[in-house]
Structures are given as C-alpha cells and as structure tokens.
C-alpha cells in the first residue's frame, strides 16, 4: 500500500495533500476550520442534490414543492433542515477561518488569500440565490431588494437589473436562472477550493508564532487527521443538535408564507450571515454609495497584505493589535445586530458609527498599531 500511495499518479496527489504533507508541529485548533469547510461543502452538495430531485423552479409550484419535500418525502424534512442550517454552519466556519487568517497573518500568502476572498464572494452569491428558491415572502422581497441595488450603477444599472430578472420584475425567469446558478456554483467553489489548497501547499501552512517551521515539520497523517476528526465530531454534534431541536431558529418566519408581490413584509432583511454587510449598506443614505460600501466591506480584505506594517507576522505577541482585532470582532457582532433592526433611531446612528469603525480599524488603526509596536520592539 505504501508503494502504491507514493507511485500511483492519483494516489500520489492525495498522499502529498493529506498524508505525507509536511505540517508545522504547533498549529492550534483554529486551523481545523479549513477541513470543516470542506466537510460543510460536501454536506451542502449532497443534501442540495437530494432537494433538487424534488424541487420545481416555477413560481406557481416552488413553494409547494418545498413543502411536499418536507411532508411527503422520506426524511425530506431532515434533508431540508440540514441544507438550510448547513449554510449557517458554513458561514460560521468561514468567518472563523477568515478571522484566524487575519489574527495569525496568513493573508501574507497573497495567492491563497485572494482565492479565499473569491471563494467568499462565490459562497455569498450561492447562499443569496439559494435563499430565493423556496419562494417565500422573504425570498421574493429579498431578491427584489438586493438585485435592485444594481440599478445604482450609472448608465447601465436599470438594463442590468432587467437582464438579471429576465423581465420587468422578479418572476419565473428569475427563479429558473437562480436555481441554475445555485446548482452550478458549489461545483465552481469546489474547483476553486482545490486551487486554494494547491497554492497553500506551495508555501506550507502558517503557524501561531508566525515564524518559519521547516526544521520541525511533522507528517499530516496521523497527527492532524486525528485532530481534524475531533473537529468533525464536535461540529457534527453541534450541527445535528441545531437541526433536530432548533431547525427554524436561524430562519425567518416570513418565509413560511408563499411569496406575494402585493404584500411587502414590514422589515425586509437577508439571512443572519449577511446582516453585517446589510447594515453597512443601510448606513449610507446614498444608494450608489451604499452599494460601493457593501462591496468594499468584503474587498477591503484584499488590502490586508499591503497594510501589514508590523515586523511580526502574527498577533500572538502584539497586545495593541490584539485589542484592535477583538474590537473589530465586537464591531461585526454589533453590525450583525443592527442589520436585523428596523431603520429608526437609535439604530441608524449606531449602524453608521459601527460602519465607520469597521473601515477605520482595518484601514487606519491596525497599520498604525503595527508601526507603534515596531517602535516598542526597539525600547
């Protein structure tokens, strides 16, 4: 088996990626989330495939086909709730994975980091078009509001919106194409994830100290396969608890009502994992400005390698930057809360302050903190 593992063309790729891969000996549990994201992706593709077998992408039957899946298909309710809550789990792992990358300076692997940002955009697009498919009230109005944002683009905005809709409003053509996008995008994400891994294995993993660890690397198997397996067990326990006991906790009650274009919900909002970006969008009174802020709230991550001013890679020994990092995390929690609140005082001003703080920490305070810490090293 050992000979085949190292000589067979296909097995050799697997061997270099998951078995004999030289890995830093000191990487912590925060490095588990890459493999957990892979698990989430496989889970979403499998459950989505079974849901697609019973789904019809027609405005008249989409809602009832989802209800039919829950009521009449064997374990359809379980598959549907696993898929819906799997998206939340996916984004929890994704945000922790990005947070770990920021904390330990992994963004200095530029190619890996930029492909990661592209993966984030694609995952957000997949989740958005997927949210439209059940054709409930929030699905319909969420699709209408978010796609309408493109009309803020000068000159071509309105034409672009109508082109995406396939008509003059969100209708059958929109639903059909969103289903097509939702089906194909996860496979594109899978391919990109492999490229992400390819670039990571070119440089090797970073570690909590942020220093080279070539002299002391250990094989990935059995050390980190065992460690990842523990993460998988913990994640699946949390996930199945959520699915079995609180399946609708993270959803919107409005989505249990069929879409009605004549009745607008009192408060239109996306799923919880988009609320921070939605709060940033709403904090700017100008439509085009809001859309630019929304896109830049994610794109700003691409600037991190160029804003790195510290002589140290990781935040492990940088107390000032650590304080700013956890302030940023707290700020994102506040933005998530604000995104779910109605547009009224005091939520408007809180959202605006939190949005300014979000960009200030990343673009101004963290680079300055890095320079101050460099000075402190000389003292």
Curated annotation (Swiss-Prot):
Molecular function GO labels: metal ion binding; ubiquinol-cytochrome-c reductase activity
Cofactor(s), names only, from the UniProt record: heme b
InterPro entries: Cyt_b/b6_C, Cyt_b/b6_C_sf, Cyt_b/b6_N, Cytb/b6-like_sf, Cytochrome_b, Cytochrome_b_C_euk/bac, Cytochrome_b_N_euk/bac, Di-haem_cyt_TM
Transmembrane segments: 33-53, 77-98, 113-133, 178-198, 226-246, 288-308, 320-340, 347-367
Residues reported to bind a ubiquinone: 201
Membrane topology: Multi-pass membrane protein
Gene3D superfamilies listed in its UniProt record: Cytochrome Bc1 Complex, Chain C (1.20.810.10)
Note on cofactor: Binds 2 heme b groups non-covalently.
Record SUPFAM superfamilies: a domain/subunit of cytochrome bc1 complex (Ubiquinol-cytochrome c reductase), Transmembrane di-heme cytochromes
Record keywords, A-Z: Electron transport, Heme, Iron, Membrane, Metal-binding, Mitochondrion, Mitochondrion inner membrane, Respiratory chain, Transmembrane, Transmembrane helix, Transport, Ubiquinone
Domain of life: Eukaryota
Binding sites annotated in the UniProt record for heme b b566: 97, 196
Sites where the protein binds heme b b562: 83, 182
Subunit structure, interactors included: The cytochrome bc1 complex contains 11 subunits: 3 respiratory subunits (MT-CYB, CYC1 and UQCRFS1), 2 core proteins (UQCRC1 and UQCRC2) and 6 low-molecular weight proteins (UQCRH/QCR6, UQCRB/QCR7, UQCRQ/QCR8, UQCR10/QCR9, UQCR11/QCR10 and a cleavage product of UQCRFS1). This cytochrome bc1 complex then forms a dimer.
Physiological role: Component of the ubiquinol-cytochrome c reductase complex (complex III or cytochrome b-c1 complex) that is part of the mitochondrial respiratory chain. The b-c1 complex mediates electron transfer from ubiquinol to cytochrome c. Contributes to the generation of a proton gradient across the mitochondrial membrane that is then used for ATP synthesis.
Note: Heme 1 (or BL or b562) is low-potential and absorbs at about 562 nm, and heme 2 (or BH or b566) is high-potential and absorbs at about 566 nm.
Protein name: Cytochrome b
Native species: Cratogeomys planiceps
């Amino acid at each position: 088996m050992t000979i085949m593992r190292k000589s067979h063309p296909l097995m050799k790729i697997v061997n270099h990626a998951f078995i004999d891969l030289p890995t830093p000996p000191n990487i912590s549990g925060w490095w588990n989330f890459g493999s957990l994201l892979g698990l989430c992706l496989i889970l979403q593709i499998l459950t989505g495939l079974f849901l697609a077998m019973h789904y019809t992408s027609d405005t008249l039957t989409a809602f009832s086909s989802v209800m039919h899946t829950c009521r009449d298909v064997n374990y359809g309710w379980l598959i549907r709730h696993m898929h819906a809550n799997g998206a939340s789990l996916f984004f929890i792992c994704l945000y922790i994975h990005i947070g770990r990358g920021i904390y330990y300076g992994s963004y200095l692997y530029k190619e890996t980091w930029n492909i990661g940002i592209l993966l984030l955009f694609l995952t957000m697009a997949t989740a958005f078009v997927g949210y439209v498919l059940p054709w409930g009230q929030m699905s319909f109005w969420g699709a209408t509001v978010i796609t309408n944002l493109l009309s803020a683009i000068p000159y071509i905005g309105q034409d672009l919106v109508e082109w995406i809709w396939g008509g003059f409003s969100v209708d059958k053509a929109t639903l059909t194409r969103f289903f097509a996008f939702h089906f194909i995008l996860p496979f594109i994400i899978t391919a990109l994830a492999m490229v992400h891994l390819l670039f990571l294995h070119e440089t090797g993993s970073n570690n909590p100290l942020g220093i080279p660890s070539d002299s002391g690397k250990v094989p990935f198997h059995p050390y980190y396969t065992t460690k990842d397996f523990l993460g998988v067990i913990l994640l699946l326990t949390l996930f199945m608890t959520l699915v079995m006991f609180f399946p609708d906790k993270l959803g919107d009650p409005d989505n249990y009502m069929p879409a009605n274009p004549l009745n607008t919900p009192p408060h239109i909002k996306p799923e919880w994992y988009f609320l921070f970006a939605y709060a940033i969008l709403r904090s700017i009174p100008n439509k085009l400005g809001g859309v630019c802020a929304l896109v830049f709230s994610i794109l700003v991550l691409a600037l991190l390698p160029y804003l790195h001013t510290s002589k140290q890679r990781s935040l492990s020994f940088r107390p000032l930057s650590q304080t700013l990092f956890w302030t940023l995390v707290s700020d994102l929690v506040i933005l998530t809360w604000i995104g779910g609140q109605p547009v009224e005082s005091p939520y408007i001003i809180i959202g605006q302050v939190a949005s300014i703080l979000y960009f200030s920490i990343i673009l101004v305070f963290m680079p300055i903190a890095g320079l101050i810490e460099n000075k402190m090293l000389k003292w």
